[in-house]
């Protein structure tokens, strides 16, 4: 499948931060500022709008026994596709960029070629898109004895499993010079000794893009679009052209900038987490008092 993506407008937000002072309105946890919804005037708002928590639940068969594993990651909006009005029930498609090791958790037998996984030993059973946000955007806080202004990490199950739009693996035709052939042989031997199924591992970039279909007939999917994706699209459009972002500054100039990293890492933290399910035995809404994936921001200054 070939997908042409829009300009990487979200990159502009990184550089816009270099001209602003850090905001101290965040909760502090170790070296991070966490669990805060930035206002529209705060420097982290653009990145907050574009970032999402990704949760994959996979069913794995081991020694004849079925087990479930959960993998977490962070994704950010990179593109979208409006529904085709000529096609009945055609979904809105959001494209989220993420790390390749995160996207590798997606095991979808219906995925696009060449990403379709044919391993019968396991597959992704549920996918959730999450964000640290206002509880009232999705449910009444009173249901859980929470105040009206309550905030939590809200994880929402999409009605269908995502697909892989792009994975930056085996995308370069590498031919090794004579002096590197011995090194290549050692690499192949290491791969063989590591018992990996892929004996021809090639260089890759830590980057992938997931396609998230959202159906208007699904009440929960509509909430995902209204409260997660639509604000991200507005922010994306606001950022504008980033094609020439590296055109003028030299590398030495770029080293002087301050860079902010925002996301949903796996950290132990006491913050409420709300889950909205569309399928399974626990279909509906339930709350977990604590979560291990807080919304956080940190910065790096070279």
From Swiss-Prot:
How does the protein associate with the membrane?
A: Lipid-anchor
| InterPro entries assigned | Mycoplasma_peptidase_DUF31, Uncharacterised_MG067
Its taxonomic placement starts with: Bacteria, Bacillati, Mycoplasmatota, Mycoplasmoidales, Mycoplasmoidaceae
CC terms in the record's Gene Ontology section: plasma membrane
Q: S-diacylglycerol cysteine lipidation sites on this chain?
A: 23
Record's subcellular location:
Cell membrane
Q: A Pfam family matched by this chain, by name?
A: Mycop_pep_DUF31
Q: Where is the lipid attached (N-palmitoyl cysteine)?
A: 23
Q: Which family does it belong to?
A: Belongs to the MG067/MG068/MG395 family.
So which residues are the signal peptide here? 1-22
**What is the name listed in the Swiss-Prot or TrEMBL entry for this protein?**
Uncharacterized lipoprotein MPN_585
